[in-house]
Design a protein with these regions (language model features):
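Conserved beta-strand hairpin/beta-sheet module of binuclear metal-dependent hydrolase folds
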Residues: 1-6
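Binuclear metal-ion centers of metallo-dependent hydrolases, dominated by the metallo-beta-lactamase
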Residues: 11-138
């Protein structure tokens, strides 16, 4: 698991540590990543949506959860952005959802959703990730 909170930049030295292969998992795919995302646009000390998605894609965890939100974006709007990042075309997105999706660079489809109070994440010995909110989507 990798947890990246209250950050607006990751040095190449830190990326070198994050990118190292693991003895127990030579494929080096993290099961879970938790990535900072304060608001739609970046802040001096926090990622915005674009930066969070770019970091999540580089980490390439089986599941990525965003955390550290302000109040500008609703939970459901973050879910719509996460579904888009995963390759789903939004049906009837709101104008705000369209604006947030427009912030995201083109790139690899990954699983990404907002975290929330009470979220429980379980990782099995085999690396299967389940949670108490989104596992029904599979």
């Amino acid at each position: 698991m990798v947890y990246i909170s209250d950050v607006s930049w990751i040095s190449e030295e830190s990326w070198a540590v994050l990118d190292q292969p693991s003895v127990s998992d030579p494929s080096h795919q993290y099961a879970v990543a938790v990535v900072d995302c304060l608001r739609p646009l970046a802040h001096i000390s926090h990622y915005g949506i674009k930066e969070s998605v770019n970091v999540a894609r580089r980490i390439n965890a089986k599941r990525t959860y965003l955390t550290g939100f302000g109040h500008e974006v609703s939970h459901d709007e973050y879910v719509t952005v996460g579904e888009y990042v995963g390759g789903k075309v939004a049906e009837n997105p709101t104008d705000k959802e369209k604006d947030y999706i427009d912030l995201v660079d083109e790139g690899k489809s990954i699983w990404l959703r907002p975290s929330h109070d009470g979220l429980r994440i379980e990782v099995s010995c085999e690396g299967v990730v389940k949670d108490n909110s989104y596992s029904h989507e599979e």
